[in-house]
Amino acid sequence: MSSHTVSTSLAVATLGTPRIGPRRELKSALESFWAGKSTEADLLKVAAALRAANWARQSARGVSVIPSNDFSLYDQVLDTSVMVGAIPEIYGWRGGPVSLATYFAMARGTQAEIAGHGCANGHHHGDSTPQGVPAQEMTKWFDTNYHYMVPEFSAGQSFQLASLKPLEEYREAKALGYDTRPVLLGPVTYLKLGKSADARLDVLSLLPKLVPVYIEILGRLAAAGAKWVQLDEPALVLDLDDRERLAFRDAYGQIARELPHLDIMLTTYFGGLGDNLDTALALPIAGLHLDLVRAPKQINAVIAKGPKDLVLSLGVVDGRNIWRADLPDLLDRVEPIVQQRGAERVQLAPSCSLLHVPVDLELETGLDPDLKSWLSFSLQKMGELSTLSGALSGDRAAVQDQLSASAKAAATRRKSPKVHDMAVSSRAAAVTPAMTQRNSGFAARATLQHQRLQLPAFPTTTIGSFPQTAQIRQARAAHAKGAISDADYNTFLRGETARAIQWQEKVGLDVLVHGEFERNDMVQYFGEQLSGFAFTKEGWVQSYGSRCVRPPILFGDVSRPKPMTVGWWKYAQSLTGRPMKGMLTGPVTILNWSFVRDDVPRSTACLQIALAIRDEVGDLEQAGATMIQIDEAALREGLPLRRSEWKGYLDWAVECFRLCSSGVKDETQIHTHMCYSEFNDIIDAIAAMDADVISIETSRSKMELLDAFKTYKYPNEIGPGVYDIHSPRVPSVEEMTTLLQLARQRLSDGQLWVNPDCGLKTRGWDEVQGALVNMVEAARQIRQVSAG
């Protein structure tokens, strides 16, 4: 190994940091404000303290290029909409500064609608903003588990500078002694993330109106002293057409002409530039950030084709996952680039914003010491980059201990028996195609299932969970703290389960569920019972707004030491003569909602989970279950960003589902549930899963999802959701019969089930009761119509 030294200190940059605070301080402040327990001034004071602490922590860890405007009270895309005045009329904004009431109305809706927005807490802070308005739509940020608020554009859309947040936070940092690099979402990506109610409106046609607003805020930042500004354009890693590429050239050409002395760091992440490389390199920018975790080889083409004076920001530490970097390996990769271009034209950075990882590993005191030594959270990743910079800047001796510790951690992880289980890898290697096939085709299975189950036409059921009341949450928390015994907690849960079953029988549902009161989370519940998973205490990441999630860490080979759900299913089925569904989370969803090991392909990890779930399915069938539901809520979320890579992902994802579901007899009915708003483009894969019954989210789109079935003859049974569980409103019988009649136009009566869109755990019992009583009545009326 060479000496790894250059003459000048290498800059360490972060593209963005977690906003929530080490102890979720932002969540607490937001929910207090929404509940009316604190003032706007209180909330803004907490926000300012979080920003100041963020800047201080970065500075202390050797970050020399510190971002500002990466903080948000809710979401950075919403911040951009507010900045450029893209505020739909419904929110009552008439120009001028945008109030927090308007901001949160866009994020969460107001009054009646607010309690039903996603799974957020239903609180409201009064203001003169119109009441009863819905939130903006929310969707996944690229292929992460973060959600953004979708910008809404109209044909007559105009833009104006309506918020000076980037300028205010730049000045705020400057007053504290930090000369930051402001971060803004770039104009082209911003427009591409948006939507218009008018399908004929090409959102990119709005670019000429939008760019002047960007020029105005960038000009103000430059006047305030900003030498560099970071513009995030992750759309450059997507499939783009020539018109979209031209939009980049137009926008950045105009910015450069108006602001020739402002240096722009154009940031791309979540993948490689691919066929957009030439477009990016032709832009009049001073710097380009590359994701070298997802696409390490693109650096060669950038160096070969790019301008020699282009500053390269090397995203070499994974901003999406929690694994510690192998620093000696990174040194070997980065040193030739630094020596070739010079230290002044290279920055070291995470692959993307650190928003997607927890704040501080040091808060974890209960993790296995070996596992902890393999991990790195946001603050640790900054330290890794500083160590790398030190080693490359002639300070090798000073960082030798850190380099040695990194090498040791990588070596122990590669060899650890905690990670590698020969029995699991041998079993995975022995999987055959026959194990992913049911014994008979659907038609033969359906005949046997109908004979066995004797269900009416249009059978009614729910998706799985029932309301998790405050009493249930309190009991769970008390049990976790040891305040109530296992036996007492179990008795309490059995009582809740029995009540839910009696209630379902009284309402008249045909197929019952046990309610899942014993489950904290649909992934964590299983991960805690599988080998190869670990859980943090403070490993929170933002999902949206105040909602934070604590993803499981999938660190090793996965197996199932003992049955996970059979005891609860047996107890529930003993209380009723009606069919009781076994309820499981599918392997693809468990994978996609976890921090996944990076030492094997994702498909390998998923196959291992599928084998564990297959064992559980077999045990449920052995115990007498006639129906087993395997939820794959996150199947679509795992789709790669580039369409050319979809087939590879869907092939192994479908194979894993079939592996876990195909070991049963023909007369055992396999259900699955998917909750997302479009699947027309993956209908082949959904059919290939070969579930006997699939339930899907369709009510909000008024059954538009079923348009796929006009041309595609879906063979199996399907339960299109007939009411939206995300809203507290109780739908009428007529609304649900109307939706069922729409479904009957696309599918045969024999295929249709009747169910809500999704699980009911976030709703109240009063809402659920009214809705399900009406749903059962709607099914009864449709049976009469069908019978003619």
Curated annotation (Swiss-Prot):
It catalyses: 5-methyltetrahydropteroyltri-L-glutamate + L-homocysteine = tetrahydropteroyltri-L-glutamate + L-methionine. L-homocysteine binds at I463, G464, S465, E516, D631. Pfam families: Meth_synt_1, Meth_synt_2. It is an enzyme of class 2 (transferase). Catalyzes the transfer of a methyl group from 5-methyltetrahydrofolate to homocysteine resulting in methionine formation. Belongs to the vitamin-B12 independent methionine synthase family. This is 5-methyltetrahydropteroyltriglutamate--homocysteine methyltransferase. L-methionine binds at I463, G464, S465, E516, D631. 5-methyltetrahydropteroyltri-L-glutamate binds at R24, E25, L26, K27, K140, R547, C548, W593, E637. The gene is metE. InterPro entries: Cbl-indep_Met_Synth_N, Cobalamin-indep_Met_synthase, Met_Synth_C/arc, UROD/MetE-like_sf. One of its GO terms (molecular function) is 5-methyltetrahydropteroyltriglutamate-homocysteine S-methyltransferase activity. Zn(2+) binds at H673, C675, E697, C758.
